[in-house]
Amino acid sequence: MAHNPEERNNDKQKALDNAISQIEKAFGKGAIMKLKQNPVEKIDTISTGSIALDSALGVGGLPKGRIIEIFGPESSGKTTLALHVIAEAQKKGGLCAFIDAEHALDVIYARKLGVKTDDLVISQPDTGEQALHIVEYLVCSSAVDVIVIDSVAALTPRAEIEGDMGDQHMGLQARLLSHGLRKLTSVVSKANCILIFINQIRMKIGVVYGNPETTTGGNALKFYTSIRLDIRKVGAIKDKENITGNETRVKVVKNKVAPPFREAKFDIMYNEGISKLGEIIDIGAKLGVLEKAGAYYSYNNTRLGQGRENVKSYLKANKEIASEIETKIRDLFKNHDNSIAIEEEREQLLEESVF
């Protein structure tokens, strides 16, 4: 029997190596390894379509191999944000699927956001069980980069559909999701796929203190997600008397890959989606990439125009310049380790109860 510490450590190491060898024989190579054998590399991400939100997420977008939840009130931009993620994935040559449990996907609107609808795989399942089985098959194929489920509230259990209208089905949906997510978590990671759940908000009954809002589907989704995004409409964008879009705020209420509680603000324009040009102007001016003198904006001593809308029109017509400015902004975010993410009201966010 070994008595000195070095011999004891050697014996332990031999025993561990033997155990690892047996595990690899039983479950295949890669089932277990030391961390140094698989060094932590830069997280592979897909952009959200918003520069500010990519920065607020801390890693430059949504991380692959993770489960994401986007939740918020009605007409706040949840589906719009998810469709932008699909469009960005398709730009990289990725394959995407949309599980339309609400049976409400607007194909024409999706095209306007840049989604290649001809290449988009779509399913309109009849029950929640069917939806989760379809997702499992798609994930296990390892061919799909992004899967969006719209929405959790519409994942109706089979027993509820087959039952009578007035029947009580307490906790059925929560159990369905809990069981489904247990199976999906590991396969999503292995397939390096982003699984996005769109969720709705409900009010808790009888809550006097604290936040009365909660999301549908029980608590399982809150635990299994790596990122939870709370999206809200905070104002209207007007062109004279006509409302042309919404000012939108997204709070990163949970983040397992970077510091949470950051927030991003951007515009969602009707029939256009996230206004990337608006972000380029606002963030570019804030970071000094664009020079602003009064209402005039300049870039590299070239005057872009007077007023935000005129500059947007100029950048729309000169896409190369817009792309160059965007690249400089993203490089600045990377170099500053994302510390300049839009984090207004950070202290207030930390005090709020995160459900």
Curated annotation (Swiss-Prot):
Gene Ontology molecular functions: ATP binding; ATP hydrolysis activity; ATP-dependent DNA damage sensor activity; damaged DNA binding; single-stranded DNA binding
UniProt xrefs under SUPFAM superfamilies: P-loop containing nucleoside triphosphate hydrolases (SSF52540), RecA protein, C-terminal domain (SSF54752)
GO cellular component: cytosol
A Pfam family annotated for this UniProt entry: RecA_C
A GO biological-process term: SOS response
Localization (cell): Cytoplasm
Keyword set, alphabetical order: ATP-binding, Cytoplasm, DNA damage, DNA recombination, DNA repair, DNA-binding, Nucleotide-binding, SOS response
Residues that bind ATP: G72, P73, E74, S75, S76, G77, K78, T79
InterPro entries listed in its UniProt record: AAA+_ATPase (IPR003593), DNA_recomb/repair_RecA (IPR013765), DNA_recomb/repair_RecA_CS (IPR020584), P-loop_NTPase (IPR027417), RecA-like_C (IPR049261), RecA-like_N (IPR049428), RecA_ATP-bd (IPR020588), RecA_C_sf (IPR023400)
Cystine pairings recorded for this chain: none
Annotated PROSITE patterns: RECA_1 (PS00321), RECA_2 (PS50162), RECA_3 (PS50163)
Function of the molecule: Can catalyze the hydrolysis of ATP in the presence of single-stranded DNA, the ATP-dependent uptake of single-stranded DNA by duplex DNA, and the ATP-dependent hybridization of homologous single-stranded DNAs. It interacts with LexA causing its activation and leading to its autocatalytic cleavage.
Family assignment from sequence similarity: Belongs to the RecA family.
Protein name: Protein RecA
Taxonomic source organism: Wolbachia pipientis subsp. Culex pipiens (strain wPip)
Gene (name only): recA
